[in-house]
């Protein structure tokens, strides 16, 4: 791999990908739709391609060996139309641009959320079918995006999908900051006590899996990625919050109450809880990454303890 194109490069996963690629000496072209995004990817060593997913210049993709598509609308609320615009139509646009540019490989960063329908997910593998009724706009749109990417796979254009579960780690600009803010405002509660199991995937392990998918992933295949053995959600999140110097209150909300609140406040622009959030963190969600380990040589090299240590700020660790 000599040249790669990255979407979502100013975000959590995309930024980590750029950093890893540049560390390997790979030339990186990163899509940026704003001055702020352009500044971020430039600081990471990427060449800026100005535009949005639906307006990318095909010339910026020419000569690239692979596209890493990590850009997505990941919020738990919002309309289906909003999510489809970015996650489905945006994916369609970048896939078509990559095909026109003659890029031979396309790695799509997806999520275990494509299987979320409100029921626990127990040690799911890549053979589990998409649910009939996904739990909200985000799972719906990401599932549709996956189908689109798989359908685009053909001779000369190999598409590979990775599904990391609960991405976390140093540099998180999305999930953890939101949870920290909820805790600080007294709006956080453990759904059902939080003592269920969860799979997790440190951002460094996501990057490891993405790079391996680009190098060794079988065309038209999906690979789950995790940190290894599942952990108790409450214990893990407590440690994660501690890296920010924050402790969650003991308050617990029964799952049926959370579901009722989600149903009655779904009309709000920013509801206190959503059915998507409940589906993803309100009960067990565990997946197995045996396929990635066997076929890609994936090893989740960063342990949870090491990942937490990397997140410690001087003020917290002193």
Region spans (language model):
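Conserved Rossmann-fold NAD(P)-dependent oxidoreductase catalytic core, especially the SDR/UDP-sugar
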Residues: 89, 93-137
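N-terminal Rossmann NAD(P)H-binding glycine-rich loop of SDR-like oxidoreductase domains
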Residues: 4-24
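Glycine/proline-rich active-site loop of Rossmann-fold NAD(P)-dependent oxidoreductases
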Residues: 143, 157, 168-178, 204, ...
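Amphipathic terminal alpha-helices
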Residues: 290-294, 299-318
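NAD(P)-dependent short-chain dehydrogenase/reductase
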Residues: 152-161, 165-205, 240
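NAD(P)H-binding glycine-rich loop region in Rossmannoid oxidoreductase-like domains
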Residues: 37-42, 46-93, 97, 117
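Mid/C-terminal beta-alpha module of Rossmann-like enzyme folds, strongest
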Residues: 212-273, 305-310
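Catalytic helix-loop patch of NAD(P)-dependent Rossmann-fold dehydrogenases
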Residues: 85, 120-167
